[in-house]
Amino acid sequence: MSSLLLFNDKSRALQADIVAVQSQVVYGSVGNSIAVPAIKQNGLNVFAVPTVLLSNTPHYDTFYGGAIPDEWFSGYLRALQERDALRQLRAVTTGYMGTASQIKILAEWLTALRKDHPDLLIMVDPVIGDIDSGIYVKPDLPEAYRQYLLPLAQGITPNIFELEILTGKNCRDLDSAIAAAKSLLSDTLKWVVITSASGNEENQEMQVVVVSADSVNVISHSRVKTDLKGTGDLFCAQLISGLLKGKELTDAVHSAGLRVLEVMRYTQQYDSDELILPPLAEA
C-alpha cells in the first residue's frame, strides 16, 4: 500500500463546510444523491457519507443494495479526519440511517468531533416513517435516535409522524404538535422544524412549523400534488445551506420550502419521476 502513497501533505487537503450522512442511490434523486448537488449549488463544499447504497428507491419494480457495513461506515468517518479534511467544518447533517449501530457510531464520532469544533451545527432529520406508511426503518432506530443523536443535535426536522414516535405524544393538531416539539427542546436542542404540520386542505396549503424556546412560527406553502421522492432531503439540504449562508432560522426554512416547490414544479414540466434541479437564482 505504501508504494501507492502519493498524497501526504495535509496542508493541501480539500476542506468541507458540511458532512452529509444519509442514503445514496445509483439512480434517482433522494438522500445524498439530491442533497449534495443542492448544497454545491449554494457554493458550499460537502462530503457525502453513505449509510445505505441502493440501486434506486423501493418504488420501482427492481431494487438492489442495502446498509453499509459498520466497519466501512466507521472507516468513512475516520478517513475524513485522517485526511485532515475537517479543519473548516461548520455543519453535519443526517438523514436516512441504515441501522441503529450506525447511529451509535455516528454519535461517538460527533462527540469527539465537537471537542475540536465546539460551534459545530448538527442537524438531524430523524427519518423513521410517515402517516401513510407507518414506520419504514428498522424497529430499533427510533430509540437509537432518542438515545444517541437527539442529545447532540442543535436542530431536528421531523414530520408529524416522526414527532409522534420520538415524543410518544399525539400531534395531529397544530397545538399538540407544537407542545410535543417544545418537550424535546433542551440546552443542546435549540429548535424543531416540523415539516408536515396540519395545513389547509381546502386552500391546498401545507404548513411548516418552526419551534424554539422563544417563538413559534407557522409557514404556509402551496401544496403540490405529486409522488416525487426526496423532497424532504432537498428541504434539509437547502435549510442547512441557508443557515450557513447567514440566514435566520425562520427565513432559511421559508426559503428552503420555496426552493422545494420550485424544484417540484420544474420536475413536473419535464414529466420526470425523479427530482431535477434547475439553476439556483441568486437572491
From Swiss-Prot:
Organism, by scientific name, is Escherichia fergusonii (strain ATCC 35469 / DSM 13698 / CCUG 18766 / IAM 14443 / JCM 21226 / LMG 7866 / NBRC 102419 / NCTC 12128 / CDC 0568-73)
GO biological process assignments: pyridoxal 5'-phosphate salvage
Protein family membership: Belongs to the pyridoxine kinase family. PdxK subfamily.
Q: So where does Mg(2+) get bound?
A: Y136, E162
Binding-site residues for substrate, renumbered to this chain: S23, H59, D233
What protein am I looking at? Answer: Pyridoxine/pyridoxal/pyridoxamine kinase
E.C. number, please? 2.7.1.35
SUBUNIT field:
Homodimer.
Where is coiled-coil annotated?
none
Pathway involvement of the protein, from the record: Cofactor metabolism; pyridoxal 5'-phosphate salvage; pyridoxal 5'-phosphate from pyridoxal: step 1/1; Cofactor metabolism; pyridoxal 5'-phosphate salvage; pyridoxine 5'-phosphate from pyridoxine: step 1/1; Cofactor metabolism; pyridoxal 5'-phosphate salvage; pyridoxamine 5'-phosphate from pyridoxamine: step 1/1
Leading EC class: transferase
Q: What does this protein do?
A: B6-vitamer kinase involved in the salvage pathway of pyridoxal 5'-phosphate (PLP). Catalyzes the phosphorylation of pyridoxine (PN), pyridoxal (PL), and pyridoxamine (PM), forming their respective 5'-phosphorylated esters, i.e. PNP, PLP and PMP.
What InterPro entries does this protein map onto? PdxK, PM/HMP-P_kinase-1, PyrdxlKinase, Ribokinase-like
What keywords are assigned to this protein? Answer: ATP-binding, Kinase, Magnesium, Metal-binding, Nucleotide-binding, Transferase, Zinc
Q: What NCBIfam families does the entry give? A: PRK08176.1, pyridox_kin
Q: Which reaction does it catalyse?
A: pyridoxal + ATP = pyridoxal 5'-phosphate + ADP + H(+); pyridoxine + ATP = pyridoxine 5'-phosphate + ADP + H(+); pyridoxamine + ATP = pyridoxamine 5'-phosphate + ADP + H(+)
- Which GO cellular component term is one of those annotated? cytosol
